Amino acid sequence: MAACLDERAVIVTDVGQHQMWTAQAYPFSRPGQLLTSGGLGTMGFGLPAALGAAIAAPDRQVVCFSGDGSIMMNIQEMATAVEENVNIKIILMNNNSLGLVRQQQELFYNQRVYASDYRYPMDFVRIADGFGMKTFDLAGISDPKPVLKEALNRLK
């Protein structure tokens, strides 16, 4: 991912497993490069924070890592991004569940999983298309790097 971005890119995370993975795996190289709510559990933080970052620094790439649970907390802000012509990229990790909640249930509640999986899969590509966002679906792609690079470097 980092190889596809400018070194000045601002990385924003929502709350969930994707937040942990981003914090652990992304090669951050300077202060202020990561915007996250930390351990405060504020699902829905990512998309509005990415909008703010992109408005404050329109010359920098802004990428929001989110999960299917977190993005649904403020999904309407996709409309704001399109209406205000804000250049953000959303990397959505969709596992059809509240992944971090599910993981905690598996680890600490003897595999008793309750209300952390969604009954019906959500089609986020169609939703984003409906808001007028450009979309790329990496599901099932054996080598996602070329598509990811194109998506991240596309202007809006």
Show the residue positions of the predicted features.
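Fold-independent oxyanion-binding glycine-rich loops
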Residues: M1, D14-G16, S37-G39, G67-G69, ...
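Active-site diphosphate/adenylate-binding microenvironment
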Residues: M1-A53
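Phosphate/pyrophosphate-binding active-site segments
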Residues: M1-V15, T135, A139-K145, K149-E150, ...
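Structural motif
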Residues: A9-I11, G32-L35, R60-V63, N87-I91, ...
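Short, structured coil segments at secondary-structure junctions
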Residues: S29-R30, E84, F131
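Conserved thiamine diphosphate
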Residues: A56-V147
